[in-house]
Amino acid sequence: KKIVSYSYPFNRSNQYTYFQPNFDQLNVSDFFLFRCDNFDTVFIAENNLAIFTSDPVECKHVFYFFSISGSNCGRFEVNSDSFHYQLKIDSEMTGGETIGGFIHQTEYSSEFLEKIPGIDSKQLIFQHRGYTGFRRKESSSSCFSFLHGNFGGMYIRKGKLLSISRQRSEHYYTPQIIIKIDKFYELFFLNPTSKMLIISIILVDKYNKSRTIGNSKISPFGSYKFELNTFSKSEIENISWKTNLPVGRAIVFENNGVLFDVFHT
């Protein structure tokens, strides 16, 4: 006997829609966070075709930067034939913006693509899920804390920013972390969609009582920083947020006044 019936709405999911580009070299990028405030930011950009062919390939890396309000605030490009290119992001690249998001795009010469057998440039899709590293400014350490890209699906077409990301039904997103005492948290939310995104942040105590501690509207392609100080707290709590993003992850910086950690939720 069938135990699960399709008549129940919670057994259904949104229908998958295949996206086929009609132009050459589609680049689908995650939405990455940059910080030029009291942190240094580096980005490890992949040269997809060099990795695919196991040989150095000349690649143009193009980076587009967006402010907290979602406006285009900077563009930087560089040519490299290395398998990976490390970019150190500074405020000159970001138009003076200290916090925001960015995407990564690549371009290859059509002459090179024609030499690779079996490749149709109109069916060639590059996915950029590179790694972003963070380190406190003027740190004596040469090490960065890295994490991969956040939910994106963004690309540039004829100079215009577009996205295949869509907002879905409102739901609660509960990460696998706890809010500890004696910490300072910075939660960064990025909106990879072309619509205004509403976020409500909720804390849940050990008695399972919840309270809303923050609400924000994030502009299309914008970002939002939420701060939470637990130095005066006496108990551990859980955190959730209400969102319309299918994958509503935040980027979290956890500080104790001396050390910090950065991770996805």
For the regions a language model picked out, list residue spans one by one:
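Gly/Pro-rich, tryptophan- and cysteine-flecked surface segments typical
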Residues: 1-265
